[in-house]
Regions:
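Glycine-rich, basic loop-to-helix element that forms the pyrophosphate-binding segment
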Residues: 1-13
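Short, flexible, basic/aromatic active-site loop/helix in glycosyltransferases
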Residues: 67-88
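Short beta-strand-to-loop acidic/aromatic patch adjacent to the donor-nucleotide binding site
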Residues: 16-26
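A short, conserved beta-strand element in the Rossmann-like catalytic core
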Residues: 25-28, 113
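Active-site-adjacent helix/loop segment of glycosyltransferases
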Residues: 132-229
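A short, conserved alpha-helix in the catalytic core of glycosyltransferases
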Residues: 89-97, 101-106, 112-139
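Conserved donor NDP-sugar-binding/catalytic core segment of glycosyltransferases
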Residues: 30-64
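Active-site acidic short loop of glycosyltransferases
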Residues: 13-16, 107
Length: 230
């Protein structure tokens, strides 16, 4: 998967700053300035996201904001964004990553088969664990050919994403998944009782193992983000 390839690449490179892009992209050397390099070397940011353009030089939606619509998780995307503003995730995985912070998050979850939910998983987790992804308008990259649109289908990968990122509740200085969340998950998953219970228990154990790494929960995160953009 895309995430697995990036995980492997992160383990092999020596530098702490890693630019992830596709061989169908072009980046002009004119944009590589001392000012840009100084920005990208900032160690407080998980990922710097560039402005992206199609092969027809049309802006792509690089600013992504999490929201809850009718009780369901959703992402609102915008092609216009302020420099150094936050975004939930890097479009098409493209950006300058801080390798140490990336590895500290555990990298991409290889068990997720959906590119979209694999990307959303580490993106939401990064914010829940106190990281941030920032848009850098001075870094501009364009595609040289067509590209595939994101497949946001709610599949099995979404269920694992839901358990790991949307189900935990943050109390005091740690996070946990309430047992009562199981019935909500059971109805949402369309899985049989025993299979749903097994996956739910695995997720509870994972959250328990990492409970002190959480700095907030999804509900609080999304509310704060929406207030910032009012």
């Amino acid at each position: 998967s895309t995430g697995e390839m990036i995980n492997l690449g992160m383990q092999e490179v020596r530098n702490n700053k890693v630019l992830v892009l596709w061989d169908t992209m072009h980046i002009s050397t004119k944009v590589i300035t001392d000012r840009l390099l100084t920005t990208l070397l900032n160690d407080d940011v998980l990922c710097f996201v560039p402005f992206l353009f199609t092969d027809q030089m049309q802006n792509l939606p690089v600013k992504n904001i999490p929201s809850i619509d009718d009780g369901s998780f959703n992402v609102k995307s915008f092609s216009v964004a302020q420099d150094f503003s936050k975004t939930l995730y890097p479009f098409d995985f493209v950006g300058v990553y801080d390798k140490n912070r990336f590895i500290n998050l555990g990298g991409f979850d290889y068990t997720l088969t959906s590119r979209y939910w694999q990307l959303l998983d580490i993106a939401v987790r990064s914010y829940l664990w106190g990281e941030k992804t920032i848009i850098c308008s001075n870094l501009r990259i364009n595609y040289e050919c067509d590209f595939s649109l994101e497949d946001t289908t709610l599949d099995k990968s979404y269920l694992r994403f839901f358990l790991k990122n949307l189900s935990p509740r943050f109390v005091g200085d740690y996070a946990y998944i309430p047992k009562k969340e199981f019935f909500s998950y059971l109805n949402r998953s369309s899985l049989g009782f025993f299979k749903a219970f097994k996956t739910f228990k695995m997720a509870r154990n994972w959250v328990s193992k990492n409970k002190f790494r959480f700095k907030t929960d999804a509900q609080t995160l999304i509310s704060a983000w929406e207030n910032e953009n009012e």
